[in-house]
Amino acid sequence: MENHRGFLGSIHRLPFVPKRNLRKDGNHLLEHLYVSLWRDMEKRRYPKRKPLVSNLLHDREAVMLYSPTGVGKTWLSLSIALIAAGRGSLDLLDWRNDEAQPVCYVDGEMLEEDIQERIRLLIPSLGVDENLLRKNFSFVSRVSQPDSNEDFLSLDMEQHQWDLLKWIRDNTRKNSHPIVILDNLSNLVEL
């Protein structure tokens, strides 16, 4: 048992040194990571996570949909957004939301009028409260920006990351958990 404790103690003291991702000033991006040992972690009590869309999405979660083009990722993510923002449901998958949440849907490839058409088609089948949807659903489209706006959201730019975090902060209120949907990631990062 003594060897076991010594082994854990030595792990706790090991520094984390990434092999890449150096900042411009030469320091590692991840040099100050918080590390939890099981002996500490097992004692912690975490707050119960709130379902935002039952059986699918909870607060403090990240979800990524991945599949080839043309299989319906936008339809699916838009349905999730509408259920969350408009207190809707999809009985087939047992998805529902009893408390409307603010949603920012950022689209990198579709025209706003195409999304409008999809939303109009989805509203009746999802039982969305349209008044809540009007209040809680924000949509940002890359291709619907005016020509004068050359600087669309690009997640590899630090200022744009801060802008997105500001939206989250501005839309966080008691019992609300802002949801950001990025559709699709490859169009929102300059490669």
Regions found by a protein language model. Name each.
Residues 10, 16, 24, 35, ...:
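Generic detector of low-complexity/intrinsically disordered segments
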